[in-house]
Amino acid sequence: MCDLIEPQPAEKIGKMKKLRRTLSESFSRIVLNVISFVFQICVTKMSTRNCQGMDSVIKPLDTIPEDKKVRVQRTQSTFDPFEKPTNQVKRVHSENNACINFKSSSAGKESPKVRRHSSPSSPTSPKFGKADSYEKLEKLGEGSYATVYKGKSKVNGKLVALKVIRLQEEEGTPFTAIREASLLKGLKHANIVLLHDIIHTKETLTLVFEYVHTDLCQYMDKHPGGLHPENVKLFLFQLLRGLSYIHQRYILHRDLKPQNLLISDTGELKLADFGLARAKSVPSHTYSNEVVTLWYRPPDVLLGSTEYSTCLDMWGVGCIFVEMIQGVAAFPGMKDIQDQLERIFLVLGTPNEDTWPGVHSLPHFKPERFTLYSSKNLRQAWNKLSYVNHAEDLASKLLQCSPKNRLSAQAALSHEYFSDLPPRLWELTDMSSIFTVPNVRLQPESGESMRAFGKNSSYGKSLSNSKH
């Protein structure tokens, strides 16, 4: 029998709540600084399962002595995702800005009291880190966890994106917000959205980002039927460049999808929304398998695996690559996890222990649940891959059911698909845009650009002639 809890006087309860709020506020302020420090000192303790072609700085698990291994624990529960269908999945994006992470939180009121990041300046001038240093111009999107505004800095006049996170009265700062802020503070790269400022008040935490006017989802919606092949190549190169940067720092994004890839008016692609990102060296109980929008979620995670590494992001890269070329999502599941897996296996083949060692040990893999499919050439599923030299080969090396077989971001940058790009692109510093290299620019989009490219390319012509 459970012990009963005696009722507490109202006055005592009020004092306890006040104490809890005070401790929560203090903790959230401290943790924003501490977690970055912990992240830096823990990186050498990281161990990972390797993707193909991963840099030697990330060592395969089997090269680490047994007494030095740090493993993520797999937690198996009685939950079966196949027994209860999820809601129909739809591709959506936040209005005019992808840099928003919808999570649960309660609304709060604004407070002028500033907690962090004050910069020295005159007493009457606007300051970085001050709530009144930014003017809200328009709302871009809203969720239960955060609201994003287009704003303007009163300090330098630049446009910004203000991600206003409402703090729970008793719980303090959501950990997803702390995680995003702490990771982005240390990331400086041309292909990662820049965090300008952090404003912490009693009721809100505001992350001030550079303003980027659209995202890849909106860009593809505006140009249906597949993007210009040269633009696909430049977008993919930038995506891999940004991922290689964070993967070398032992950070997984974990939520790659077109909505989280911002596109500037000059064509720069920037990784955004690091609310689910994880520093692999920071200990945690287990990685949740409820990450990544269903269409871009890899089969190992769909089957319940909680032991994953940078290879998780590389599956999403493959899906986005195919979608940019084909003009439709690679695996647009419409029902549930079962349907999503069936769509994957229809193209890549139903896995077994020979094609994917260890698949039978995954929590939700039951062979009798799946139709037995054999693998096929990717061009049979997505014909436009055949229009572009080496595109099918690169896609096939990214879309591997077994995570260990997926190409790493660094290795993908060296793939033949990119061989016709200027060599200077591989020599750029982290903060240099690819568009600083002469003759590197986006091409005009048209509805028939991919089809026209296929007919005019030597590869496309050879395929066309082989049909006659």
UniProtKB/Swiss-Prot annotation:
One of its GO terms (cellular component) is cytoplasmic cyclin-dependent protein kinase holoenzyme complex. Its EC number is 2.7.11.22. It catalyses: L-seryl-[protein] + ATP = O-phospho-L-seryl-[protein] + ADP + H(+); L-threonyl-[protein] + ATP = O-phospho-L-threonyl-[protein] + ADP + H(+). The modification Phosphoserine is found at residues 24, 77, 94, 133. It is an enzyme of class 2 (transferase). Pfam families: Pkinase. Residues 134-418 form the Protein kinase domain. It is a peripheral membrane protein. It comes from the Eukaryota. ATP binds at residues 140-148, 163. InterPro entries: CDK, Kinase-like_dom_sf, Prot_kinase_dom, Protein_kinase_ATP_BS, Ser/Thr_kinase_AS. One of its GO terms (molecular function) is cyclin-dependent protein serine/threonine kinase activity. The active site is at 255 (proton acceptor). One of its GO terms (biological process) is Wnt signaling pathway. SUPFAM superfamilies: Protein kinase-like (PK-like). Gene3D superfamilies: Phosphorylase Kinase, domain 1 (3.30.200.20), Transferase(Phosphotransferase) domain 1 (1.10.510.10). PROSITE patterns: PROTEIN_KINASE_ATP, PROTEIN_KINASE_DOM, PROTEIN_KINASE_ST. The keyword Metal-binding does not apply. Residues 102-131, 448-468 are annotated as: Disordered. Belongs to the protein kinase superfamily. CMGC Ser/Thr protein kinase family. CDC2/CDKX subfamily. Found in a complex with LRP6, CCNY and CAPRIN2 during G2/M stage; CAPRIN2 functions as a scaffold for the complex by binding to CCNY via its N terminus and to CDK14 via its C terminus. Interacts with CCNY; CCNY mediates its recruitment to the plasma membrane and promotes phosphorylation of LRP6. Interacts with CCDN3 and CDKN1A. Interacts with SEPT8. Interacts with 14-3-3 proteina YWHAB, YWHAE, YWHAH and YWHAQ. This is Cyclin-dependent kinase 14. It comes from Oryctolagus cuniculus (Rabbit). The gene is CDK14.
